[in-house]
Structure formats: C-alpha cells, structure tokens
Amino acid sequence: IQLRDSGLGYFALAFKCECLHNDRVTQKNSNRARYIMVGGFLGAGKTTSISRLARKLSDQGLRIGLITNDQGSGLVDTAMLRSKGFATAEIPGGCFCCRFNSLVDAADGLTQDSQPDVFIAEPVGSCTDLVATVTYPLRRIYGDQFEIAPLSVIIDPVRAMRILGIKPGRKFSDKVVYIYLKQLEEADVVVINKMETISEADLNHLIDRLDSEYPGKKVMAISAREGTGLESWLRHIQASEPLSETAMDVDYELYAEGEALLGWLNATVE
C-alpha cells in the first residue's frame, strides 16, 4: 500500500490494520468465559437454582467456576456447592458492589485452578445496583476475558405477590421493599422460582403484573427443586446479551438503611 497519496493511502493502511486487529480480537474473544450473575432476595432459592444450572452446564461438557458472596464468612452456600464437586470461590465480608477487585481476583484464582468456561456468581441477597458496579466494569475493563450474560434476578412468588400488592400478607418494611424493587428494576431476566408452590392462575397473574410493571424484561418461571423450566432459562442466558449498560438511580442512604434492617446468622451446628 502506497502512503504517498495522502488521505486515501493512510486510510487504506488504517483499514487493513483495523481488520487485522478485529481478527485478533475475534480470535481472542472466542476464548472468553461466559459470566453469569444470578441475584435475588434472601430466600428466593438462588443457591439451589445455581447448583441446578451448574449441573446442566457441566453435563454439556463445560467447566464451571462458582463465586459465592455474603456479609459473613465460612458460607453455607460455598460448602454446599463445593460438596457437589464444583470449583467454588468465596467473597465474604461485603457484597460484590463494594468488592469488585475481590470478585476479579476470585475469577483469576478459579481460572488458574480449573480454567472455567462459565462463571456463575451469586451476590448477597440484599445487593442491588449490580449493573453499574459489576457487569458494566467487567465488560469495559475485562471484556477480553469475559462474555457477560443477562443479569438474572430470582424471586419467591409468594413474597413477590405480597410486595406487588397481588395478595395480602406480611411483607418487609418500606426500606427493605425499596431494595427488593430495585433488584427487579435492574434485572434483565426475572426468574420466578418455586412455581410449584402457587396455582397456575396466581402464576399467570404474577407474570402479567411483572410484564406490566417492567416492560421489556424477560419473565420466566422455574422450579429449582423439581428441575422444571431450567432448560429455557439456560438457553436464554447462554445466547442473549444484557439489555442495558445504563445505571439506574439509587438512593444510597435509603439502600443502606434497608440493609441495616436485615441480619445474618453464621453458625455451625453439630
């Protein structure tokens, strides 16, 4: 390519370099690990769902790395997942949104030990604003290592129907409900777990309400205990991209007050 002809020559060289660069990026990106984050409020069944999901991915011949997270240490979730044979790293003492570097370090450690094809990360049940604090920086800073899946948020249907005003019953204080609703707001996929615990009519009512309140989001129903609906969920998060990189508005003072109302008990019982 001749560079003497001012603009056109330089443009041709730049185009060629860009093509070579894109070829290298495509080749490198083909080796990226899929990064799946599964959030949701306390008691929604995240760990059981993740265990089921990991088993199905493992059955596809994929290597799985799991990352657990909670406010305490020596997590029961970690012990349970390790007992099922999965390579599992633990981030105690704070949620992913405040421990981003620890999250990256955990993924690096799993990569060195077992070279996962897929990472599944489970944030603290009271955590929200994960798009701004985790998935966006992962994509922007470590996009050559990770292919980011849509953010799934798992919900308990009975609790969700009470909070959304579909059914009467006890629910959390307004400050805790604020966190719950923010989790739904930022989800790419809302996964109704424990579908076997409610009637088909109630399930359809809940799906309709979620579709109405959160248009554009994928709403799915599963039973982690019975194994129902997991294939559809897995296909979606394997093939789809996150809906948005836009951070939502969060009142962090209200968020902190809501978290302060929640408590954790870590104990080993013999």
Give the label of every model feature segment.
Residues 10, 16-21:
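Short, positively charged and aromatic/hydrophobic N-terminal segments
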Residues 123, 154-159, 187-202, 220-229, ...:
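G-domain G4 guanine-recognition motif of GTPases
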Residues 27-44, 48, 239-270:
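P-loop NTP-binding site
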Residues 29-39, 44, 48-178:
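Nucleotide-state-sensitive switch-loop elements of NTP-binding domains
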Residues 1-8:
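Low-complexity, intrinsically disordered Ser/Thr/Pro- and acidic-rich segments
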Residues 181, 196-253, 257:
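Canonical P-loop GTPase G-domain recognition
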Residues 178-186:
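Membrane-proximal helix-turn-helix segments that form the acceptor-binding/catalytic region
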Residues 84, 186, 214-215:
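Short, structured coil segments at secondary-structure junctions
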